[in-house]
Amino acid sequence: MNYSLKQLKVFVTVAQEKSFSRAGERIGLSQSAVSHSVKELENHTGVRLLDRTTREVVLTDAGQQLALRLERLLDELNSTLRDTGRMGQQLSGKVRVAASQTISAHLIPQCIAESHRRYPDIQFVLHDRPQQWVMESIRQGDVDFGIVIDPGPVGDLQCEAILSEPFFLLCHRDSALAVEDYVPWQALQGAKLVLQDYASGSRPLIDAALARNGIQANIVQEIGHPATLFPMVAAGIGISILPALALPLPEGSPLVVKRITPVVERQLMLVRRKNRSLSTAAEALWDVVRDQGNALMAGREGDPLYQI
């Protein structure tokens, strides 16, 4: 049997008003349209639901039973839809966000603090992992969204750039390179390099920049955690290349950073599954992360370190 929700609502309204004309006025239909709708419902059920007189509409026993049950069902349906609407607008609950270590250490704390200020009922849950794990966790739906270094073409994901930043040379203050205002990539030829391994989203960009400038990389150490770069370089093991987000330098360290020319930048991106809606709470935190990325970019505009 094929009933429409509209037919059921029309019938219940007629049962309540005991009049086709009053029911039509209440729901915005003509009297003939109301009568036709009820007649179709009777045809579908095979049961007479109303007795029509010149002055009023009288429910049959079957019509009375159907009207009572439909009223309860329609009330429950309306209540369910209202609850669903409130749930969709709710700015509370748990939002799972994944980011690589440098991003987690130097951007996400501000994001969490701002989310607590704006949305105290949303729990910002951070998963601090290597980039490849972040990408897979987004694809598998284990997190709501992530922040990564530009992953390149990814047809199954939706990406939004929130921050562009340069790479710097990290060296000991006693290094010959420390006296330069800007260091050309060619100056790294033959130098001992301490770099992050391929768990970092920045490593492919650094490799590409070295190759593009004809540098035969002399990599003496590859490390997993970005904070390890600082003591390695401070100990004289080599020099390094690191993104702006890894700054500032540890307090009291014998290290300096220099701009490398020509400039090579990386992009930080918000990433989510394509064609999948975020919850209202997750959308709110997505906006918070975007805003913090934009604020960080704006705060660097007057810093001489970022001027070439």
From Swiss-Prot:
Spans through the membrane: none
InterPro entries in the cross-refs: HTH-type_LysR_regulators, LysR_subst-bd, Tscrpt_reg_HTH_LysR, WH-like_DNA-bd_sf, WH_DNA-bd_sf
Keywords recorded for this protein, A-Z: DNA-binding, Transcription, Transcription regulation
GO cellular component, one term: cytosol
Any one Gene Ontology BP term: regulation of DNA-templated transcription
Pfam families in the cross-refs: HTH_1 (PF00126), LysR_substrate (PF03466)
DNA-binding region: 20-39
Disulfide bonds: none
Residues spanning the signal sequence: none
Domain HTH lysR-type: 1-60
The keyword Magnesium is annotated on this UniProt entry: no
Keyword Transcription among UniProt keywords: yes
Gene Ontology MF annotations: DNA-binding transcription factor activity; sequence-specific DNA binding
Family classification: Belongs to the LysR transcriptional regulatory family.
Name assigned to this protein: Uncharacterized HTH-type transcriptional regulator YfeR
Species the sequence originates in: Escherichia coli (strain K12)
Lineage: Bacteria, Pseudomonadati, Pseudomonadota, Gammaproteobacteria, Enterobacterales
Encoding gene per record: yfeR
